[in-house]
Amino acid sequence: LMKHASGLFRFKENYIYVSEADMMRLHKVFTQEKPMNAYQLLQTALSGEYEGAPVRLTAEVKELINELTSDKEIALPEGLNAALRPYQQRGYSWMYRNSRIGFGSIIADDMGLGKTLQVIAILLKLKEENVINTRKEALVVVPTGLLTNWQEEIARFAPSITTHIHHGTARDLKRFDADVMLTTYGVCRSDSDLLKKHKWAVMVIDEAQNIKNHETAQTKAVKSIPAEIRIAMSGTPVENRLSEFWSIMDYTNKGYLGSIKNFNQEYAAPIQVFNDEQVVHKFRKIISPFMMRRMKSDKSIISDLPDKVEQNQYALLTKQQAALYEKTMLAAMEVIEGFGEETDSQKLFQRQGLILQMILALKQICNHP
């Protein structure tokens, strides 16, 4: 057909024009060795295209897509000691629907919009439905500084949920007897062999940018812990590059975006290097059911939030600090200026290193109590 059609061929009672590029794409589809997996089929359904060609969906697939993109409100758990704002209700309902279908969620609201409350509401709902029970509990992984905050927030908004902090040198998994275990990324890495033997109904990670580097031992440890439902919380799901988002999505919905190599080829490079708007549009479509992000600057989200007020407060250095600051700066500048206008790459690298060392030393002097 590719050799003889010359762009126009007869199909049933109609003539169809197909460009050479279209034919090459079709040939690639029909000659590929591996059939599409379930995630690739879902991406095709969500984007409405395959290899640039529009697709038609069956009634069953349309029903699944409608369920994924539904905005139907889910009843709040009875024991919740809080009234959710409309946008929080939407976030809670969205995470609940995803969890019941079998997908993970990335809640990426701006800081201050109540991500923790929305997730606590989910945990309570799942406990009331007996998804979280004495045989399968919930694991919440947070930075060390947030352990107590999480425990207090759960006690405040969902007092019927019992918690246990798994942290410190005396920690013992055998002593765990609660609905929710609270632990840290560091402990997750140290105790991953024990934690992944436990049956978890839900696993939540707060400040999910802690697993943005997919190659670190910490990220691998977190992802190795099995859970039926996964939720990631982050106000900054992408800080520098799209591979960070891939790593978080690989935690919530493993395999959905393919391997990191394929992801870089199909999405990261076209978006970051070539700013391909078509790829950006497709990428947004395929991730939208699994990530929700609302901004404080969006007045349609929260109209009664007051404008941010900044107040600058200046602290003076003590005489001892000021003298040490000046002495350190002069000594460092003398060494740095000794390099002159050197253009040798190695010398430039050394000079840059000395500048960074000086800045760090000056910051330490300013922070001295």
What residue ranges belong to the model's regions?
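Charged, low-complexity intrinsically disordered regions
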Residues: 1-63, 245
